[in-house]
């Protein structure tokens, strides 16, 4: 039986070099870390990503939600679809986290929504030794392009059963992934999973995926304990 942490530490942080605003939450006895990549038109305050992050905290997984763009960059609509730029921002966040003693040794995963899913996959392909798992919620993994074939991290694609068009794009991207992978379709759910029980299904799929693939190795457990 998993012992749920009773407390968590919340930090409002700034990710260099641009000072992107973020929220880092570290539960008691944390054993893994997940970085979130929000979709177009969203931010670190995404209510759906926040709900997923809080649930992961209950599983003992630390989370970072942060803005992928500066306010000035958000004014240019083209930037929200600039997947290489968004992936670079994830890389900046990973580099910063690796310098934070409280989370530097934790196995790391990425959770991406919409366009953020493509950015997460590109970042995972570029950092195979650091990124250990990826989850996409209502994502556009097809926008990751050639990076799909390079992803080594176990990848879970979650899509709503009523998210017509996006299902097909996920199925096509799924076929291009070569590593450990799974595709879960939530029956009756649309793109933002507002239907009763839909987001809860996303949370359950994501938490179990990260628990399975972000389990610390024996050397990692020793470093975290030491």
Which residue stretches match the model-derived regions?
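Serine-hydrolase catalytic machinery in alpha/beta-hydrolase-like enzymes
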Residues: 4, 11-106, 192-197, 201-202
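Gly/Ala-rich beta-loop-alpha elbow adjacent to hydrolase catalytic centers
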Residues: 112-120
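A conserved short beta-strand
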Residues: 129-141
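Short beta-strand immediately N-terminal to the catalytic nucleophile in serine-hydrolase-like folds
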Residues: 109-112, 137
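Catalytic histidine neighborhood in serine/cysteine hydrolases
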Residues: 177-192
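Conserved alpha/beta-hydrolase "acid-adjacent" motif
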Residues: 164-169
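Catalytic active-site module of serine/aspartate enzymes centered on a nucleophile-bearing elbow/loop
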Residues: 189-192, 197-226
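Short beta-strand/loop motif that positions the catalytic acidic residue
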Residues: 151, 157-159
């Amino acid at each position: 039986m998993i012992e749920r942490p009773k407390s968590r530490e919340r930090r409002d942080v700034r990710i260099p070099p641009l000072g992107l605003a973020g929220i880092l939450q570290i539960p008691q006895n944390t054993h893994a870390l997940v970085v979130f990549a929000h979709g177009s038109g969203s931010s670190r305050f995404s209510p759906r990503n926040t709900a997923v992050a809080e649930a992961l905290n209950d599983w003992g997984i630390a989370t970072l939600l942060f803005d992928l763009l500066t306010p000035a960059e958000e004014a240019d609509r083209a930037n929200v679809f600039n997947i290489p730029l968004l992936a670079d921002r994830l890389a900046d966040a990973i580099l910063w986290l690796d310098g934070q003693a409280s989370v530097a040794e934790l196995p790391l995963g990425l959770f991406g929504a919409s366009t953020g899913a493509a950015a997460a996959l590109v970042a995972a392909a570029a950092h195979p030794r650091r990124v250990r798992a990826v989850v996409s919620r209502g994502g556009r993994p097809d926008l990751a392009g050639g990076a799909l074939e390079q992803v080594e991290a176990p990848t879970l694609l979650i899509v709503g059963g009523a998210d017509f068009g996006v299902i097909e794009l996920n199925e096509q991207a799924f076929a291009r992934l070569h590593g450990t992978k799974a595709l879960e379709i939530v029956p009756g759910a649309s793109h933002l999973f507002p239907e009763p029980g839909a987001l809860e299904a996303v949370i359950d799929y994501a938490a179990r995926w990260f628990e399975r693939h972000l389990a610390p190795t024996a050397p990692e457990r020793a470093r975290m304990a030491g």
